Each structure stands twice: as C-alpha cells, then as structure tokens.
A protein has these predicted regions:
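Residues located in well-ordered beta-strands
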Residues: 64-66, 120, 159
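Amphipathic/hydrophobic helical signal segments and adjacent flexible N-terminal regions
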Residues: 1-85, 165-181
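Contiguous, well-ordered beta-strand patches that form the walls/edges
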Residues: 68-71, 91-145
Length: 181
C-alpha cells in the first residue's frame, strides 16, 4: 500500500548551495529497519527538514515510486536524498546509505526476509549503483529515464512511475492501476 500523507510525497526544498543550507545530511542519525520490519504504517521520512543540496553527480530520485512494468509490478518505494545520502524505504525495510563507495557508510541492515545485508553505494553516470559486499559490479541500479525511473535488481528490470500526493488522503488510482499495465 502507498504511504498516506503529503509528507511522504513532498521532499524538503534543498538549499541553493552548501553555504546556505540549514541542516546537513550527516547531522541526521542513520535509520535502520526496526526489529521485524516496519509493518503496515509507513515510517516518517528520515531526511525531513534536511536541505543539503544533492551531490553534483546524483540523479534526483526523490519521491514515492511504483513499479508499473517488470517482474515487481506493484512494488512501492519511497526515496529520500540529501547531499550524498539516500534512504530507500520499502517492503518493511529502511535502507539508509551514503553514496561514497564504502561499506562503512553504505547499507548495513536487513533485507525483507530478515537476512543481513552489507552494500556499498555510489553515484555513477547519473545512476545510483549498489554493490552488495562491495562487489566490483553493481548488482542494483536506479536511474531516471524521462519522467520514469528504471530499477535494475540483478537480472530483473523494472520501470517505475512517481506517485503524486493523494488529494483525498488515499491513493485510489492504485486500486485499478494494475489493469493499466
């Protein structure tokens, strides 16, 4: 189910430059997945109020996205960004990382089944590339293609659309959208 409430859909406005920012991404504690996952209710955005400008090479992936084509049709994720920091919240997990190519500041958390994950993240050619266990090759990538995002997860390729703020408090278009794809 898509998150309810505009705070999930409208990211904090970013400062024009680092000199004018009020809150840096590094000043916000790293979020982790709660024991057993986050359940039915989407957690509050981690980077709310953080106005650090995105890194120059970072694609702006911020928003709530839904897979509309590919093997994971229906999957919904929220992506937050500030500076080099990226937080991806989906399927009960919160993956908070700094895209600096290190495992230390990458994702050190659990997958949706509770198994441990350790992933380095890096921005490369306007993509967010993820390297589980710091492998040489990116196993997961996200990048923009026009108004859509492409999410490659191993051999699987998915196309996502950014969801808009629900005007009636509920994302009613999600109820019938599966018929449209």
């Amino acid at each position: 189910m898509a998150p309810q409430g505009q705070e999930h859909y409208i990211p904090t406005a970013l400062a024009v430059d680092s000199a004018s920012m009020q809150t840096s991404a590094d000043s916000i504690p790293v979020a982790t997945t709660p024991e057993g996952g986050w359940g039915e209710t989407w957690p509050a955005p981690v980077l709310a109020g953080c106005d650090e400008p995105l890194a120059d090479e970072a694609p702006d992936l911020r928003g709530v996205w839904k897979v509309v084509d590919g093997p994971f049709v229906g999957h919904i994720e929220r992506i937050e960004q500030a500076g080099r920091r990226v937080v991806i919240t989906a399927t009960g997990v919160i993956h908070d990382m700094v895209a600096d190519g290190t495992l230390e500041r990458g994702v050190n958390d659990v997958d949706p089944t509770g198994g441990a994950v350790s992933v380095a993240a890096r921005f490369n050619d306007s993509r967010l590339d993820l390297f589980p266990n710091n492998m040489r090759r990116a196993v997961v990538t996200r990048f923009l293609d026009g108004d859509e995002m492409v999410w490659r997860y191993g051999p699987y390729r998915n196309r996502l659309r950014r969801l808009e703020v629900p005007t009636d408090g509920v994302h009613t278009e999600l109820l019938n959208e599966a018929d449209d794809v």
